[in-house]
Amino acid sequence: MGQEMSTQSDMQNENQKGNKRNLKGSQGKNGLKERSTSISKEIVKNSFNNSKLRPGMFIQNSNVVFNEQYKGIKILGKGSFGEVILSKDKHTGHEYAIKVISKKHVKRKTDKQSLLREVELLKMLDHINIMKLYEFFEDNNYYYLVSDVYSGGELFDEIISRKRFYEVDAARIIKQVLSGITYMHKNNVVHRDLKPENILLETKNKEDMIIKIIDFGLSTHFEYSKKMKDKIGTAYYIAPDVLHGTYDEKCDIWSCGVILYILLSGCPPFNGSNEYDILKKVETGKYTFDLPQFKKISDKAKDLIKKMLMYTSAVRISARDALEHEWIRLMTSKDNVNIDIPSLELSITNIKQFQSTQKLAQAALLYMGSKLTTIDETKELTKIFKKMDKNGDGQLDRNELIIGYKELLKLKGDDTTDLDNAAIEVEVDQILSSIDLDQNGYIEYSEFLTVAIDRKLLLSTERLEKAFKLFDKDGSGKISANELAQLFGLGDVSSDCWKTVLKEVDQNNDGEIDFKEFRDMLIKLCNY
């Protein structure tokens, strides 16, 4: 609009200087209209091409019908609000855990707000140790939240089974929890209910335990300059500052300290016969290492617990500093990541050659890479990502990309002696500009999966059809201008303005994209 106003102003100025064009004639009107339309097209094109892509943009309250899309297999668990059902996608065959929440139990306004806030937070969070939300929909009786199946069960059950953990295993677990919390706090999100019941193990593989933080019902956005006041949480894990009604994001660190204490000893630092007694002990902040279980625990481990359980939030260690604590670095320094070399070679090739500037193709691939892949399909890529993520915060910055890229080339068997740092940096900068789809200066986990995965794996008919249906909201068999505008958050625009944007894909020039055009676009991209 600013450009259009400027154009009209310039023409008025020309008239004032004696340039007596007759804008009242039909030719003048048409010329101005054509120029205005041209500018509008350019604005739409620029807005579209500069739009930021995030996995959360694909999670919308859709019109999916549960029994048409999914087949329920068995109940995985029950809670006060509903149940979790192991379900199979009828189109792709993939299995998901679907949380089914009865609307009878979400009658209060605050309960519905809590549910919708949880969905919004999960839409924005993209981290290897945070549960992934695939879909959210509702019908007359229920809300449905679709996520991965984490077959390893709760960390709580693993604690009961093991009694207590070796230091190295406890460090591996708490490092992942802190990685997720560091990422959350960096994005101004506080969990407020961290406990072993809300930490799931991705698989039953005890050698390579990957954890997932779940249940964001009590989570919220926070501001560093403001204290929170809601007294919420679970007795054993709640921080004293929460009980006092004035706290910040470091309430999560207190909970991590309690979890680490339990992992190493098998018992909570603040115990009691009932909730009242437990909370009274939490309020004092006093605990002890004078237990038989702690006699063989290192001073460094105890030091981290002490720093996490500092009574005053201002002097309590931050998530970032806890993640970099000497004990965690020492315990996890020898963790070897065995990377499959063929997978590594393919991922490096895919990363280097990802140069698509077609925003629709990028969006389709991001959806397929982040929402239509399974844990097994991304297992090797997850290892590569973790190896590159040197500071463990779940994102790759420029420096990590430079170091990690060189390491991966060596692992692949390439001779890097002739590659100077400047050449590596140039290549990394090109990679970063190509695959940083949300333009935040980091490579998120889903962005990495999207560009590194075997794209031919993604292009099954079932996956292509599901991706197409995401864009084709009205089920007409074609993706319209307004459907794209909705998805990219650009508002209603005229179809004419979108023809310029879509011309690379729209082969028959009808102003819409059919399935064949959509499929051809992705096949062309994957053939480099």
From Swiss-Prot:
Question: What positions does UniProt annotate as the active site of this protein?
Answer: 193 (proton acceptor)
Can you give the residue ranges of the EF-hand domain?
Answer: 376-411, 423-458, 459-494, 498-528
Activity regulation (record text): Activated by calcium. Upon calcium binding to the EF-hand domains, the C-terminus of the junction domain (J domain) undergoes a conformational change which results in the dissociation of the pseudo-substrate inhibitory motif from the catalytic domain. This, in turn, may facilitate the autophosphorylation of the activation loop at Thr-234, which leads to the kinase activation. Intracellular calcium increase is triggered by xanthurenic acid (XA), a small mosquito molecule that induces the differentiation of specialized transmission stages, the gametocytes, into male and female gametes.
What Pfam families does the annotation carry? EF-hand_7, Pkinase
Q: For Ca(2+) 3, which residues are the binding ones?
A: 472, 474, 476, 478, 483
- List this protein's GO terms for biological process: cell differentiation; male gamete generation; MCM complex loading; positive regulation of cell motility; positive regulation of cilium movement; positive regulation of DNA-templated DNA replication initiation; regulation of mitotic spindle assembly
Which Gene3D superfamilies does the entry link to?
A: EF-hand (1.10.238.10), Phosphorylase Kinase, domain 1 (3.30.200.20), Transferase(Phosphotransferase) domain 1 (1.10.510.10)
Keywords assigned by UniProt? ATP-binding, Calcium, Chromosome, Cytoplasm, Developmental protein, Differentiation, Kinase, Lipoprotein, Magnesium, Membrane, Metal-binding, Myristate, Nucleotide-binding, Phosphoprotein, Repeat, Serine/threonine-protein kinase, Transferase
Q: Which family does it belong to?
A: Belongs to the protein kinase superfamily. Ser/Thr protein kinase family. CDPK subfamily.
Name listed for the protein in its UniProt record: Calcium-dependent protein kinase 4
